[in-house]
Amino acid sequence: MTDTRNGEDSGKLLYCSFCGKSQHEVRKLIAGPSVFICDECVDLCNDIIREEVQEAQAESSAHKLPSPKEISGILDQYVIGQERAKKVLAVAVYNHYKRLNQRDKKGDEVELGKSNILLIGPTGSGKTLLAETLARLLNVPFTIADATTLTEAGYVGEDVENIIQKLLQKCDYDVEKAQMGIVYIDEIDKISRKSDNPSITRDVSGEGVQQALLKLIEGTVASVPPQGGRKHPQQEFLQVDTRNILFICGGAFSGLEKVIQNRSTKGGIGFGAEVRSKEEGKKVGESLREVEPDDLVKFGLIPEFVGRLPVLATLDELDEAALMQILTEPKNALTKQYAKLFEMESVDLEFRSDALKAVARKALERKTGARGLRSILEGVLLDTMYEIPSKKDVSKVVIDESVIEGTSQPLMIYENSEPQAKAAPDA
């Protein structure tokens, strides 16, 4: 096989045997026995082979379903704590995909039902991260929907069918793949009924959305336009069966612990209410573990909706020790991410242990859980990340407690010189 370029070997104009382009239209033309192929066709062939190999690998991994212990072990690498929630999720997801693998077998009279999942936990406790990690582990399409943007059909806002459309977009509109996917609906507590009493005004973003989600979560054939939603009614609709899509709903359910405490506190009114102070001493996570379906109904979810989410997992509030672990231990820990950013500038980044404690304390004060850690670090490192690319002689940056508290600037160590630190700006 020879490389032919610009007609150097002969005066005859040569063409690619596959796409028909001449040797002047391509960068390179490779000659074989009586055939020619251009560099563009070679690239195309490589892409086709790569896609087919990836699909084959995805299929083989889909048949190899990890055990609940293996699923929980992989979740441990990304999510700190929340052991019970991991166990509940691992078993539920394992049973769900085991059910899908068995559904085509003939002669089995027992039909296995779908078990959708409800995650309850304070903000920043890891609900979304758990769902994302599960989808990545199982190599299935995954999408996140925000319940607060959903409205009933016919009103301004997103239809519930838009959730399935987003899932289709994640897998290039492959309906078969989408039907095996995972949908995470966040802020599900925000669509609770505004009141226990019936109202003459229509609650289009609360109970109305719950009613619209019922069939979708339980299993129905949703008609989804390839693009544009309501704006292009003339488009041909795709039919997506949601019976095998796993729905995970998550929410902070602020105030649910009070509903639980009111139920579990027996007797005692007036002078007999001493029991309540004991109950109020419980952490939110401890109270949430005692949640029952009736508590969710009192909170504002309709009974039919609660019934469609039989698997319930509660997450605990993160304490200072857990937040410190989150900063350093997971595969994608924040300190590792920022260290990588600094490494790209050939600078080492070091966090002292007292700095990590200070960051964890600040996040606890803000009550934002793990989600608040990034914003704290971003604020602390902003000036340093602004300056470092312009300084070629910095070899290391050290962050201690005083930097987190704002009383001093990060310590910069320069090559072949003594450590230097800028004075804190005057307040």
Curated annotation (Swiss-Prot):
This is ATP-dependent Clp protease ATP-binding subunit ClpX. The gene is clpX. CDD domains: RecA-like_ClpX. GO terms for molecular function: ATP binding; ATP hydrolysis activity; ATP-dependent protein folding chaperone; protein dimerization activity; unfolded protein binding; zinc ion binding. SMART domains: AAA, ClpB_D2-small, zf-C4_ClpX. Residues 4-57 form the ClpX-type ZB domain. One of its GO terms (biological process) is cell division. HAMAP family: ClpX. ATP binds at P122, T123, G124, S125, G126, K127, T128, L129. ATP-dependent specificity component of the Clp protease. It directs the protease to specific substrates. Can perform chaperone functions in the absence of ClpP. Transmembrane segments: none annotated. Belongs to the ClpX chaperone family. SUPFAM superfamilies: Glucocorticoid receptor-like (DNA-binding domain), P-loop containing nucleoside triphosphate hydrolases. GO terms for cellular component: HslUV protease complex. PANTHER family: ATP-DEPENDENT CLP PROTEASE ATP-BINDING SUBUNIT CLPX-LIKE, MITOCHONDRIAL, ATP-DEPENDENT CLP PROTEASE ATP-BINDING SUBUNIT CLPX-LIKE, MITOCHONDRIAL-RELATED. Keywords: ATP-binding, Chaperone, Metal-binding, Nucleotide-binding, Zinc. Zn(2+) binds at C16, C19, C38, C41.
